[in-house]
């Protein structure tokens, strides 16, 4: 069993598991942190960005000044943002049989894999994962395509040139694999390969293994996966949460008795308490609005935004902010808000029960009805007419490199009355803000990440007790900025096996058993013999028939009856006869009793020597020795067949035949 690690990002995993002749891809996350190296794509022409100076090498050579621009001491690529793809050279991706998706954030690289690698298999995911994943992809494509940029930068990617660049461009990894965004046509083609599954649904893969999705408690429809055969079990835990938010709670019990547990997608902010962050978010938002400023919340169109809107619903009246408009701007805003209300079966029990009252599961429905929350596809059109300040705007993209958020950063960045509040943990907020410097607006970092922290993981591993844990190397050592915090790493016994991008891991257990069915007529013919009290054995002579990874023992063919005529035999009739098997022997030879038996049968001058594996009985007069070991007995004599047979018969008296 092998694990191929195609992604270096611990919360955006992409691994391939080879297990019992099946090749299974576990997630296909897309590392978007590469976009932080690019200039933002403004919806409205930005003189500030257009007039940034080009960057030159230290020797004054300016051949890169069209590709690289400098802003407040940072250097950025002036081109359409590109994404860091999973490894495509480590394994032939056309051999992948299935792709298992754990949540909608971990499927963003799907079109690159299904459309450009020769992949012909099936993708499995829950319905909310597919529908919300579609929204995320649609929003991403829309953000990139609505701001066309003719210029394409590639000179800086040359290895000899890249090492001359300042950080972080100099340190960027795998830049040759970075690619532009896919198209909606590729998105639709990729999604057409997905087969919808429900929690606890068992899916057979070629008769070899069975895969089952379990609720992971992190997002709508998010899953952990069990991959098992009759005698082996692998658990894949990715993006899980034990906090009570809007999704169904995590199914922990089904993870027990795993041979291997692959662990990814832990919290990116292990020292931040989500509840505390939500409190800070609300108080900073209220403070800004009371002072006449606007609040910008860069976010994804699904996930944490539902919880933030629910908190604001409970908070704004008590804080005296009921007249402050909330705007949600995204090409998929309407679809996202509607989907959150119709996926009732995937919600926690508390929200499920509201559906039957009838009451909307999420309070943002009431915010929309009372005109406190308004949603728009973009800043153009109706939004321009309705827009009033001070206000709170939820919009994307959290990287601040594309989407409507770029417009608001340019619009509000010059005033210290305004505040941008970062709640998504996927991007460094300092790097996200770099191309907007100098910046007057206040910046608040309230990362809300409900995924498992290290304390919760340690407790979980003690409860489910897998034989082996496999995880990204980032989880086996403290964060570089907090090297003294030994509590910010996985602590388990035996120690976790770690992996990094482009590594192949041989998983530390071997398959020992295979399930075989036996036909009734063959079973009827068996005659078990008791070799120990309560233990019986029977020899089986049979034909092993294997098809679709299922094995069947059939009765051996009967010997062909001789025919009198000269009729030609058909090829199919020419079945080889089964050989007559020698009886199997069982038992042990007690040395003292064996020596006594030899003496009774006329052997003298017998000497016994102990060895590491058993005993040697020397018959010095006959120049013969008998090696008695745990699993074999050898009679060594010099060309005296009669003596060997005589000794063999004496040995057989101590063994059972069957």
From Swiss-Prot:
Cross-linked sites for Glycyl lysine isopeptide (Lys-Gly) (interchain with G-Cter in SUMO2): 58
Database matches in SMART domains? Beta-Casp
- Pfam family for this entry, one: Beta-Casp
Positions bound to 1D-myo-inositol hexakisphosphate: 2, 19, 510-511
Q: Which keywords label this protein? A: Cytoplasm, Isopeptide bond, Nucleus, Ubl conjugation
The parts of the chain that form a coiled coil are none
Identify the residue span(s) of motif Nuclear localization signal. 566-570
Annotated InterPro entries: Beta_Casp, Integrator_9su, IntS9-like_C, Metallo-B-lactamas, RibonucZ/Hydroxyglut_hydro
Q: Provide a GO CC annotation, any one.
A: nucleoplasm
Q: Spell out the residue ranges making up region: Disordered.
A: 548-574
Regarding protein family, the annotation reads:
Belongs to the metallo-beta-lactamase superfamily. RNA-metabolizing metallo-beta-lactamase-like family. INTS9 subfamily.
Additional facts recorded? Although strongly related to RNA-specific endonuclease proteins, it lacks the HXHXDH motif that binds zinc and participates in the catalytic center. Its function as endonuclease is therefore unsure.
What is this protein's function per UniProt? Component of the integrator complex, a multiprotein complex that terminates RNA polymerase II (Pol II) transcription in the promoter-proximal region of genes.
- Name under which the protein is recorded: Integrator complex subunit 9
Can you name the source organism? Homo sapiens (Human)
Q: Which gene encodes it?
A: INTS9
